[in-house]
């Protein structure tokens, strides 16, 4: 009886080729049906859609190809992202890091789809350029104006980024089958998904700072959920609890941030437009899928690995929701159809009628729903870990908790207060924001020791189960990628070179123009600063540590480079980001070059406070290590003394025994 039951269970855990083939057929038929509906929408709404936006009509081909291509390319990217995450979360790697056979099947899915994704993204560059110029693709290519049309189209440039990232993913998936490779490939895949999400409606008009941040989170969450649904349907097994938790989390994020985007794009929640109706349709589908996932997670816990049916239905539902979003992406949001755009709307998304003061910096808030929300989540997660340790009766230094929470609070303030609001329009305030993100906040976060806390809180996965969060974190800590990035020399080069590369090249002209550029700079400087200070005062395991004198030397070695950077900004006669700052044309700012010189002075002077903080932390750590070493040596000395006495006593007993014989 027991053997039969075990055999039956083992058999049910392996998806049969027939079940996989049926799932693939259902998804293929559903995909063709969804594409047909999207094509019909593009054909029927074509001329009217362009007339409402005041754009020239490029013809029926572009009117149909744009929404269909947008949907197909977005779906391919989502499937690649979901497949990679599925492999990362379900694989049972061999000792050499190679993924197991079950995960390799999903790897092959991502490998095949990535090539299709590349082709679709490259095609969309031409289609999007034709859409924005109002001519057909053949005429555009024949005129030789394709490059100029692409340069003038933000969405076409977004598709170029997506195509480049898809090329990287497609090439790497054919070369690497190790677990770590899939983790690394999440970076270009997410970048590709975000590249097209931040163009179009989210990147223009009033409140586009809110919309861009929301679009980034929504696009990644929605693509992850869609990709995981399709990957799970093709795998033919019930997703693990970790995958299901990820789906529920992504569904909640997509619903929350999607509602925010609809609020920003549809004035008064008016539902009398195609855009609004499509948004509501996507919302209803997404809500239904999310509620079903919540029921499976809370009421009917999953039994990972068991064969099941019904996965294709959720995957098809997410395809339909993505089709609705693709149709919305090629339309102009109702809010912008009658809005009279100003320079504030185009370049900032909000107005700054008065110059910055301390009171305005503290009270002018535009909460960053990406970085600010991340700061809130990190603070809550750390506090929960701290509380969990205390409930177990384990200790954790309160100073680390204070350092981490202070760093998170500073992150929320820097990204959402007047520092960011004025920093997006003034170079001097932007430089204060940059220095805070690069040199002050990372020190506090590193001193919090989040990795050590996580390793103490997260449970060890039992035998026979897929690795969990603790195992993933351990593998990442000891991976070659982490070893390279956290090496003191690598961290030093990144920390020193970053400001020169960003501000003294055309990169800054692009980044400062768009809100996603400000988000990218903030994340980049925060991560680079964290890597550098991790190598110097890090509590967590990971990077190769220099001796304490070497760490102090490394800290002082960066100071001349930052001083020269600040002095260069103070003495330059040309303006960094001149085109953008002239276009914003703040009425109360008399001179943008004088503001740049002030920013250089801020960069030069603000390096001292973080250095003092790091020196204090280093000296404290050094003194504690010396005390530990001295205490250990004292214990060894005491132990040696006791051992000598014991040996003498035993020798005496042996001698007495010999004399008695």
Curated annotation (Swiss-Prot):
The chain crosses the membrane at residues 27-47, 68-88, 116-136, 150-170, 179-199, 214-234, 251-271, 279-299, 313-333, 369-389, 396-416, 435-455, 488-508, 519-539, 552-572, 599-619. The keyword Ribonucleoprotein does not apply. The keyword Plastid does not apply. It is a multi-pass membrane protein. Signal peptide: none annotated. It is found in: Cell membrane. GO terms for cellular component: plasma membrane. InterPro entries: Caa3_assmbl_CtaG-rel (IPR019108). Its main location: membrane. To M.leprae ML1998. Was identified as a high-confidence drug target. This is Uncharacterized protein Rv0102. It comes from Mycobacterium tuberculosis (strain ATCC 25618 / H37Rv).
């Amino acid at each position: 009886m027991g053997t039969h039951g075990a055999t039956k269970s083992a058999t049910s855990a392996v998806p049969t080729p027939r079940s996989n083939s049926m799932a693939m057929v259902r998804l293929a038929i559903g995909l063709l049906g969804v594409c047909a509906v999207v094509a019909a929408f593009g054909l029927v709404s074509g001329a009217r859609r362009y007339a409402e936006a005041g754009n020239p009509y490029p013809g029926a081909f572009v009117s149909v190809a744009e929404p269909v291509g947008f949907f197909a390319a977005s779906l391919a990217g989502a499937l690649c992202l979901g497949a990679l995450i599925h492999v990362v979360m379900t694989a049972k790697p061999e000792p050499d890091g190679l993924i197991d056979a079950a995960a390799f099947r999903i790897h092959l899915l991502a490998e095949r789809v990535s090539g299709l994704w590349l082709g679709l993204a490259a095609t969309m560059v031409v289609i999007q350029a034709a859409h924005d110029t109002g001519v057909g693709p053949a005429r555009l290519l024949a005129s030789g104006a394709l490059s100029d049309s692409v340069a003038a189209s933000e969405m076409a440039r977004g598709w170029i980024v997506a195509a480049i990232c898809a090329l990287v993913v497609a090439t790497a998936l054919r070369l690497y089958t190790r677990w770590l490779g899939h983790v690394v490939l999440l970076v270009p895949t997410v970048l590709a998904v975000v590249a097209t999400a931040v163009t179009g409606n989210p990147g223009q008009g009033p409140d586009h700072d809110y919309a861009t941040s929301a679009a980034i989170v929504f696009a990644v969450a929605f693509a992850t959920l869609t990709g995981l649904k399709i990957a799970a349907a093709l795998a033919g097994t019930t997703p693990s609890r970790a995958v299901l938790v990820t789906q529920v989390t992504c569904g909640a994020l997509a619903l929350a941030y999607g509602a925010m985007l609809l609020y920003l794009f549809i004035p008064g929640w008016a539902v009398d437009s195609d855009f609004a109706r499509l948004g509501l349709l996507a919302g209803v589908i997404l809500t239904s899928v999310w509620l079903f996932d919540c029921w499976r997670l809370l009421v009917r816990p999953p039994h990972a690995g068991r064969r099941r049916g019904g996965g294709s239905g959720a995957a098809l539902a997410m395809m339909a929701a993505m089709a609705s979003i693709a149709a919305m992406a090629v339309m102009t949001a109702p809010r912008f159809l009658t809005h009279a755009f100003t320079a504030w709307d185009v370049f900032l998304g909000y107005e700054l009628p008065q110059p910055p003061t301390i009171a305005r910096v503290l009270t002018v808030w535009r909460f960053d729903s990406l970085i600010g929300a991340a700061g809130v989540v990190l603070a809550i997660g750390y506090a929960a870990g701290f509380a969990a340790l205390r409930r177990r009766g384990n200790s954790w230094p309160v100073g680390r908790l204070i350092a981490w929470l202070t760093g998170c609070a500073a992150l929320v303030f820097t990204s959402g207060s007047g520092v960011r609001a004025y920093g997006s329009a003034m170079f001097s305030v932007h430089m204060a924001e940059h220095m805070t993100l690069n040199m002050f906040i990372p020190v506090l976060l590193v001193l919090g020791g989040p990795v050590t806390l996580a390793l103490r809180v997260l449970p060890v996965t039992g035998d026979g189960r897929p690795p969990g969060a603790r195992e993933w974190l351990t593998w990442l800590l000891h991976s070659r990628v982490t070893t390279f990035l956290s090496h003191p020399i690598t961290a030093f080069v990144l920390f020193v070179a970053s400001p020169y590369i960003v501000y003294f090249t055309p990169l800054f002209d692009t980044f400062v123009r768009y809100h996603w550029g400000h988000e990218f700079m903030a994340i980049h400087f925060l991560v680079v600063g964290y890597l550098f200070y991790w190598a110097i005062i890090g509590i967590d395991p990971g990077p190769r540590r220099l001796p304490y004198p070497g760490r102090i030397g490394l800290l002082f070695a960066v100071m001349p480079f930052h001083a020269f950077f600040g002095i260069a900004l103070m003495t330059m006669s040309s303006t960094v980001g001149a085109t953008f700052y002239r276009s914003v044309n703040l009425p109360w700012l008399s001179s943008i070059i004088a503001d740049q010189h002030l920013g250089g002075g801020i960069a030069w002077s603000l390096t001292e406070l973080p250095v003092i903080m790091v020196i204090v932390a280093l000296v404290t750590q050094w003194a504690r290590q010396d005390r530990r070493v001295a205490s250990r040596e004292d214990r060894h000395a005491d132990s040696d003394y006791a051992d000598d006495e014991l040996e003498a006593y035993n020798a005496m007993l042996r001698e007495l025994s010999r004399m008695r014989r």
